Amino acid sequence: MKLGLEGKIAIITGGSDGIGKAAALSMSQEGARVAIAARDQSRLDKAVSDISAQTHNPVLGISTDIRNEDAVRSLISQVVNQWGGIDILVNNAGTSSTSRLEDMSNEQLTADIELKVYGAVYGTRHALPYLKKSDSAVIINTTTPGGKAPAAGTQPTALSRAAGISLTKTWSKEFAEFNIRVNTICIGLIKSGQHRASWARTHEEDSSYSLEDHWHKMSQVVPLGRVGEADEAGDVICFLASPKASYVTGASINIDGGLSPVV
């Protein structure tokens, strides 16, 4: 299916791995010009190489700490200077940080909010003047179902993800007059670098518990009976960014194999 993304300009934060990289690949395959941002330049370079080799379309990798507003401003400027505008912003950067209240430090809380909330605010704030000039502008925030139905011991992530969902709804109304659509995808259990790292920290040298065993254990709570692949989330992001989803705004869409108890 041609989604109508040919020539569109997209910025994806947290784009060097996992869901962000998958979304970048999907958009690039559809003909979009994609800039991916992350902190680790070596991982960015590898992602750019991987995507370019598969699509032969322009891809930028820009090292950016989205917790720093000046760095985000520079990211936006570099993309605009290179390609002339912005049509799509995907606020994807973030990691899982979970704790019970009695164990959570103020530093942990602050760090999570800076990354997931301030990062999205900075990106949207500085991309907005250019998104207003686009004829098909889209903002997509990635959150989790836990932002709608948090479990015990999942703060501060539950707080920051709920904020992301709230910002999505607020911005969808605030920016509608400029024909800017804003949606969020709520990501469930997806095979990602974060989960691989979690397995490696405790089981990499344990031959009795492989990474596949880890995925199988995680899948037991998922109604579809498996852990999702990054490209399954990336393809949904790509669709939401396209004109094929032109009447979808203010939505929060679960990509979780049916795990969440809420819609």
Language model features with spans:
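Short C-terminal tail/terminal secondary-structure segment
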Residues: 2, 149, 237-238, 249-263
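Conserved glycine-rich cofactor-binding loop
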Residues: 9, 16-17
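Substrate-binding pocket helix/loop in short-chain dehydrogenase/reductase
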Residues: 100-101, 105-113, 218
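Active-site helix of classical SDR
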Residues: 124, 160, 168
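Alpha-helical segment proximal to the catalytic Tyr-Lys
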Residues: 129, 173-177, 246
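Residue(s) in the substrate-gating loop at a strand-loop-helix junction
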Residues: 144
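C-terminal helical subdomain
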Residues: 184, 208-244, 248, 255-257
